[in-house]
């Protein structure tokens, strides 16, 4: 649809200053790092998806199936994110939508209707709505399982499962009421979600790194360790500066982020080696 409609897309070698948006100025003035990596919450890395392993992993017969189930699906989601990024770039370059972060939801509707027409636009919008609903459903199920197993809460009967679910649903309802009643509620909630989504990924990287130490794969531990350290820097720097966080000036926020990343690497390596040594003694 973007090619048929003739959406103007910019390449790396093009002039990044269009009539409607100066991309170069945005990258320098808006602190592209870490804001970009928080904004593209699921397209690059999604810690939120790791919460679904509690359910999905129980449906697999072997760990080899994890590559198709998790790794390949994240590559596919990255491809979807690239499509949306290109579509948004085309919409802004055409001047169909004002470049304003508060109008992001309206941009989605404009893209769907302009590229796919009224019927196709509705179908695409339904897809945009269904994806977070199904992800939320799976995440809440995983949360219930994790809480019940960690606190040793019996879940053998439907009544007991419903009781624990009701508590979780009540907490979610409070958050949704706030997002709906407050004028800036959704934007605030979305910022917290984006940050917490990337923060969750740190625990996934930590678990992978420790597992590799335990299973004599320490020479490959840099594969999860490097992105884990990077996103430690990103998430800590962002929350240190953000208004929803500690609102610290950028320079000390960057320093805090670097220190946190170094500490992350040190803790993971120390704990991983400790776990590996303990297993060797057994």
Q: For each predicted feature, which ranges?
A:
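Extracellular/periplasmic helix-exit of transmembrane alpha-helices
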Residues: 2-18, 64, 71-110, 180-184
């Amino acid at each position: 649809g973007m090619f048929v409609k003739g959406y103007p897309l910019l390449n790396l070698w093009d002039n990044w200053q269009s009539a409607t948006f100066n991309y170069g100025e945005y990258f320098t003035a808006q602190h592209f790092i870490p804001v970009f990596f928080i904004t593209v919450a699921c397209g690059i890395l999604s810690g939120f998806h790791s919460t679904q392993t509690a359910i999905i992993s129980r449906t697999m017969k072997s760990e080899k199936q994890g590559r198709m189930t998790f790794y390949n699906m994240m590559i596919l989601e990255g491809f979807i994110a690239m499509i949306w990024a290109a579509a948004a770039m085309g919409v802004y370059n055409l001047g169909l939508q004002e470049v304003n972060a508060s109008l992001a939801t309206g941009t989605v509707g404009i893209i769907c209707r302009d590229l796919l027409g009224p019927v196709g636009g509705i179908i695409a919008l339904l897809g945009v709505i269904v994806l977070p609903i199904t992800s939320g459903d799976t995440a809440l199920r995983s949360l219930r399982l994790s809480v019940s197993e960690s606190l040793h809460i019996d879940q053998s009967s439907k009544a007991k499962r419903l009781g624990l679910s009701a508590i979780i649903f009540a907490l979610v309802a409070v958050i949704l009421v706030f997002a709906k009643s407050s004028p800036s509620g959704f934007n605030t909630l979305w910022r917290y979600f984006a940050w917490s989504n990337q923060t969750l990924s740190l625990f996934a990287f930590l678990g992978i790194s420790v597992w590799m130490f335990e299973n004599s794969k320490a020479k490959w531990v840099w594969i999860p360790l490097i992105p884990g350290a990077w996103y430690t820097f990103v998430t800590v720097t962002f929350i240190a500066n953000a208004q929803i966080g500690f609102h610290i000036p950028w320079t000390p926020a960057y320093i805090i982020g670097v220190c946190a990343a170094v500490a992350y690497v040190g803790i993971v390596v120390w704990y991983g080696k400790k776990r590996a040594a303990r297993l060797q003694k057994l």
